[in-house]
Regions:
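"…together with the soluble PPM/PP2C metallo-phosphatase catalytic core" -> "…together
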Residues: 1-211, 215
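Membrane-proximal soluble regions of multi-pass membrane proteins
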Residues: 200-244
Length: 244
């Protein structure tokens, strides 16, 4: 099992945003997607390379921080948040619906939260072959006209080796593609639907602290069939990192 799929997916994402930049009149949309994806991917790669697994989940990293330890997971959380905030500012420049400074600030905060929550949610799913890549394709397919096409293409390209169990997206690829799709959602949706999307992503992130997504999927016949679709052989586990 190799983690090389993650950097390759990140490179494919950035190449796709570069092409999108040439086709887009203003270029701001593709830059926002690239900023979110690159930032999340880089800190994810750091966690892949140097991460310690003794602290898991957001609460675990907070407990470690209170004890004076800055974990690689907390560095990733901060890095994903910072890149999401930068992307949210660029998203706001693409938007004309906010006429007041207060509206722009609130809108940017919502976009930041949505992008970061989506990035982490996709990463939480990267525990079985093809699961995270399938989620990117499902979430991003309806957003290809808003900057998600590079993420969908990168996920589709990684799917064969991922499903075969030869490689995985890891924190680098999963966070990068998740952040890119989250940015596309921020670009595409009105604030009411962005709020609902964030609420759903945040709820799932919080639920992961107590509930095993894999166990839920295994107990649900439809989800189990979709999860196993295209998988060549049963795999017990792809990663020891089952939380952020």
């Amino acid at each position: 099992m190799t983690l090389a799929e993650g950097p390759i997916a990140l490179a494919a994402l950035l190449a796709g945003t570069a092409v999108d930049r040439l086709l887009e009149p203003s270029g701001r949309r593709s830059v926002a997607v690239a900023v979110a994806g690159a930032g999340a991917g880089l800190v994810g790669a750091y966690d892949d390379l140097y991460g310690s697994r003794h602290a898991k989940g957001f609460r675990g990293h907070l407990r470690a921080l209170r004890s004076g330890e800055l974990t690689s997971g907390m560095i990733k959380i901060l890095g994903v948040g910072a890149s999401a905030a930068a992307a949210a500012i660029l998203v706001q420049l693409c938007r004309s619906s906010c006429a007041t400074p207060a509206c722009r600030v609130l809108s940017s905060l919502l976009d930041t939260a949505l992008i970061a929550a989506t990035a982490n949610l996709v990463n939480l799913l990267d525990l079985r072959p093809g699961r995270a890549a399938k989620m990117i394709i499902v979430l991003g397919s309806g957003l290809v006209g808003f900057g998600a096409a590079p993420a969908v293409g990168a996920a589709a390209g990684s799917l064969p080796t991922d499903l075969a169990g030869r490689s995985m997206l890891g924190d680098c690829g999963a966070n990068a593609l998740g952040a890119a799709v989250g940015t596309a959602a921020a670009l595409a949706l009105p604030w009411q639907f962005r709020l609902l999307a964030f609420a759903a992503a945040a709820t799932l992130n919080l639920a992961s602290e107590r509930v095993s997504f894999t166990a839920v999927i295994e107990r649900t016949p439809l989800l189990r069939r979709l999860d196993q679709l295209g998988r060549r052989e049963p795999v017990l586990s792809m990663s020891t990192n089952d939380q952020t």
